[in-house]
Design a protein with these regions (language model features):
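Conserved donor-binding/catalytic loop of nucleotide-activated donor transferases
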Residues: 153-155, 176-180
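A short acidic/histidine/glycine-rich donor-binding loop in glycosyltransferase catalytic cores
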Residues: 198-203
């Protein structure tokens, strides 16, 4: 309700990082599992619970990795952009929104002969029905997070657009952390401090 809007606090964009090393990740995973099973009455999946700790360690990097990556030399004719091809249905209409916007950027980069473009959209089982529409924009390789970070830092510009359900994706926060030159479509949500067109973002 609108009368409660003044009480709402806008959150800053954020992204996942590796919080602990392997030993502490295992320790906290199982100690928190014991606490959860002891105090909750609801049934839950042990596999999903422990899987979150596994993904935190295997798929994310420590914050220090982002700080160190700021020193990577930028290649002035190189653009790297890798993103998710989200599944589409009658409610989210991602093929008319985020998927289409990302595809337009990818196609524009590929059409500019003086740009060395690398990347695309990564499909999943859920988004198979959209593959045909964006076949020319799909990326079929798997890369490590360290590689993604290095190539993103090497890119002379990065691209941002509101993601699933118009949320601020992790990439916006990662780009800001890395101090990248950001090209973006209009932001869909308020921020604690606005990003100003022509100052810290180009919309």
């Amino acid at each position: 309700p609108k009368q409660y809007h003044p009480k709402l606090v806008s959150l800053a964009p954020s992204f996942g990082i590796r919080v602990w090393g392997i030993a502490n990740a295992i320790l906290f995973a199982f100690s928190n599992l014991v606490k959860t099973t002891r105090y909750t009455r609801e049934s839950f999946s042990y596999r999903k619970f422990l899987g979150k700790y596994k993904r935190m360690y295997t798929l994310r990097l420590p914050y220090k990795s982002y700080e160190k990556s700021r020193n990577v030399d930028i290649k002035n004719d190189y653009i790297f952009f890798l993103s998710t091809l989200w599944y589409n249905d009658e409610w989210n209409k991602n093929n008319e929104g985020v998927n289409k916007t990302r595809a337009n950027f990818i196609r524009a980069c590929k059409d500019i002969k003086t740009i060395d473009f690398e990347g695309g959209m990564v499909s999943s089982k859920l988004s198979q029905s959209s593959n045909r529409l964006f076949a020319d924009c799909l990326y079929h390789k798997t890369i490590a997070m360290k590689t993604w970070l290095y190539k993103t830092c090497k890119s002379f510009v990065v691209f941002n657009t509101p993601a699933f359900w118009n949320c601020h994706g992790w990439k916006l926060a990662e780009y800001l952390t890395l101090g990248k030159a950001i090209v973006s479509t209009d932001l869909s949500n308020d921020l604690p401090a606005p990003l100003i067109n022509g100052v810290n973002i180009h919309i």
